[in-house]
Amino acid sequence: MGTVGFILAMWVVDGMGWTASNIQLYFGAAASVVLGIYAFTLPKCEIKKKNSSSLFEALGLDAFVLFKTPKMLVFFLFAILLGAALQITNAFGQEFLVSFNQFDEYKNSFGVLHPGIIMSISQISETLFILTIPFFLKKFGIKKVMLMAMMAWFLRFGLFSVGNPGAGVLLIILSNIVYGMAFDFFTISGSLFVEKETEDKIRSSAQGLFLMMTNGVGIILGGYFSGYVVDFYTQETVRNWSQIWMVFAGYSLVMGILFFFLFKHDHRPEDYNNGTFI
């Protein structure tokens, strides 16, 4: 449901003409206050009491023991690299479309006037691809599914490099559709993989570690890397988006090739029950 809210927010901001306005921030702040007040009306949840644990365990640091396992070490390292890819598209996807307003042939196109609606196709695709994860995980296993995600990132950026809001708008739309696979086939599948590969006592900490690698370390590194690349291909105020997206596409391709050779995992379909992990 969070993704549905994401889509609605993008449509509201776009429809109200707030794309380049700080009004969207005030709107978001007000909505957060209302949601926070509503949260106090929700039923109380019983908290399961656990046996006393050390501060080390309470902080979730016990999950770092997973780095001793080569397979999990490689997995978390690539979680960082994929988190960087996510930051790239989050930071520059919409700016890419808006930048075409400096060209007469594109400035009145739907993609330039309503970039939020065009980019929301990515989240719509995300809600659909998530339904396919049980089938793909059982059929192909985590390694091939994650490789699909990396190749989807390659297509995501590659299609951006040749697309535009005019005659090439279908390529932009296709890139947004591919995003659903790029995001879900790693973020959701990766979470399920962590669920299966970890013991009960550190499972919640392991999920937190996975989130930290993708949305923490990966986002930070992706911000620095993408910022450097974008600045490198910017002359005065004009960005060479084709070259920028090609660099990011190349990054995703190299990442996929390295993952293919470095990540060792034997898929066993019998580990799945009705498409989910036992």
Mark where each language-model region is.
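Short amphipathic helix-loop junctions that connect adjacent transmembrane helices
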Residues: A91-P115
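Helix-to-loop junctions at the C-terminal end of transmembrane segments
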Residues: V13, G17, L128-I142, V230-D231
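Multi-pass alpha-helical transporter architecture, strongest
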Residues: S32-K44, G216, I244-I278
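Pair of pore-lining "gating" transmembrane helices in MFS-fold secondary transporters
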Residues: K68-T89, I177-V178
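C-terminal ends and interior cores of transmembrane alpha-helices
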Residues: M151-P165
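Intracellular juxtamembrane helix-capping segments at the cytosolic ends
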Residues: M1, F185-E199
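Juxtamembrane intracellular "pre-TM" segments in multi-pass secondary transporters
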Residues: P43-L77, Q102-F103, K107
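A membrane-interface helix-boundary motif in multi-pass transporters
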Residues: G15-A31, Y228-S252
